[in-house]
Amino acid sequence: MNIHFTYGKEGLNLKLPDESIVYTSNYESADIDAGKMMLHSILNPVGSQSLSKLLQKRKKGKIVIVVSDITRPIPYHSFLPELLTYIIDQGIRKDEIILLVATGMHRASTLKEKVYMFGQYIVDNYLIIDHRAENIDELITLPGKSWSGNEIKLNRHYVEAGFRIITGLVETHFMSGFSGGRKSICPGLVSLDSIQLFHGYNFLNHPNASNAILEDNPCHQENTSVARACPADFSINIILDQNKKINCFFSGEQFDSHETAISYVKENSCKKVEVLADAVITSCGGYPLDDTFYQCVKGLVNCLPAIKENGEIIAFGGCSEGTGSIEYKQLMKKYSFRTEDFLNDIKNGLFFIKDQWQLQMHIRVLKKTGQNNLHFYTSGISHDELSSLSVNAHSFPENMIEKSIQMHIDSIVASGKKIAIFPEGPYCSPIEK
């Protein structure tokens, strides 16, 4: 059978055996315009009054709308204009509205990315602010402590807002169980200290810090407690189909609407593992998720429940922006072929640096497959650099990627191995029985 896999902006077409185990989401395509879907959602909210009624009771201050950054493939341009028009129709001026980008520790958005995400009109007419976790002057310390006993420091614009709206993509998440909802606030809008704790060794070493698991998941418990300390007044949860188009919205009370969205995602993009595969062929999600190797790690971790011990993974990502941050590149190079040393060092608190959590999650994959069986294909990173990233490196020019991967697949098929495939990468998650 011929299967289209997401890869960069264009994708790859690969031939697989008909008997391959296929992990794909089963969302039905929505025929309704995204803006109209969103309006229907906010007029028929889960667990709250409609947005218009809530806005009538708002406190004095700005209307802050929390949005995701470029690493999330939310097509804001398809519904945000309608949301802003709806808010303005309630008697609110444009200069009373702030779009706050929940970057966590990601870099600030570029102008080009803002135009891509929101459209030129919104960029020209609304104030857009990127959260900077390292800027202590832009943080406010709240009374009380988080679930872990940590201080809660949140973005000043969010805390001081007269009305808070959060938006987010709900999908499985390899640390928090599911994304969206409370995750827009923590780690999206918190301090550097909170992010370090949230992504620290102890949290991520817990077996329940994993895809589609919420119970006893320390990441979920922590960010839920932070979100409850300064909750949103309204939440808009977005579900994307396998083509990264909006499938539906669940809006309303922050926690009720998020739980409803999670139930929907579980039903449509979480597939129980019936038979373990000898080899997995997986996308890393395509653009924009696979822009960096750092983000591609999500695709590597996602497929673990579907593969046997010492199984083989063939993964691929466009990596048009390369490996990731400077800190991440340096870390990966320093601990190349020394991943156990890395775990010991962070466990003993010898250091904490940005993006170390991604290597900790990466090591989960290495422990199951070994580095030789963890193949990664890309045209965005040189062979020398890719070889330092604790994978079996395959770097080829763009016009040779598809052919090279197909040859590898053909060799696996010839060996008689049972194959599982993930055409969408981490947007469909295997769940252990």
Residue ranges and their predicted role:
Residues 209-287:
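Membrane-embedded hairpin module used as a gating/binding unit in multi-pass transport
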Residues 18-59:
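An N-terminal, well-structured beta->alpha segment
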Residues 62-73, 98-104, 281-283:
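Short glycine-rich or small-residue beta-strand-to-loop segments that form or flank ligand, phosphate
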Residues 109-178:
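An acidic, phosphate/nucleotide-engaging active-site surface
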Residues 73-92, 297-307:
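Histidine-anchored nucleotide/phosphate-binding helix
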Residues 94-105, 312-318, 373-378:
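Short internal beta-strands
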Residues 2-23, 43, 371-433:
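Extended hydrophobic packing segments that form well-structured cores
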